[in-house]
Structures are given as structure tokens and as C-alpha cells.
């Protein structure tokens, strides 16, 4: 039997806790293309795809340069789609 798993969505406080960043640092990194942007969950709610965040954090740990991080984030955001 095949069980379909869905990406886990985490809210901003969880991202801040995981990264240790301030809100302004998080949004500056998103603006600079160094961290994946949030997704809309509703009219007034947004969240972050946990797997995307983890991929970028792992790349930071691995010592990716700023340019490599930008490329990774661009690929992550570009590849967002509904997979059936």
C-alpha cells in the first residue's frame, strides 16, 4: 500500500527558533534570495515548507557560498508545484 506524505508546514516562530535569527534577519535573507519565501495558508496566515528550510540550513552548514545559496533557493522556489 502506498501512503502519500505531504510536506510539513511550519510557522514563522518555528523558523526563527530553528535558525536563531530575528524577524528582520529572516525577512532580509528572504529578500536577498538566501532563504525560501513563505507560502500563503489563508487570508492572514503564512508558513514555510519545513523541508525547504532544512535544505537551506544544511547547505549553510556545508559551507555554501552566498551565490550557491541563492542558486539553491531559486531552484527550490522554482520547483514548487503540485505533484500528483
Residue ranges and their predicted role:
Residues 1-28, 52-63:
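Polyanion-binding surface elements
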Residues 54-84:
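A short, Lys/Arg-enriched interface patch at domain edges and termini
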Residues 18-47, 70-81:
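Major-groove DNA-recognition helix of helix-turn-helix-type DNA-binding domains
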Amino acid at each position: 500500500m502506498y501512503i502519500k506524505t505531504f510536506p510539513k508546514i511550519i510557522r514563522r516562530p518555528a523558523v526563527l527558533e530553528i535558525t536563531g535569527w530575528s524577524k528582520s534577519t529572516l525577512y532580509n535573507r528572504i529578500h536577498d534570495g538566501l532563504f525560501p519565501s513563505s507560502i500563503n495558508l489563508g487570508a492572514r496566515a503564512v508558513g514555510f515548507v519545513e523541508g525547504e528550510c532544512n535544505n537551506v540550513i544544511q547547505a549553510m552548514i556545508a559551507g555554501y557560498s552566498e551565490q550557491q545559496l541563492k542558486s539553491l533557493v531559486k531552484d527550490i522556489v522554482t520547483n514548487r508545484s503540485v505533484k500528483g
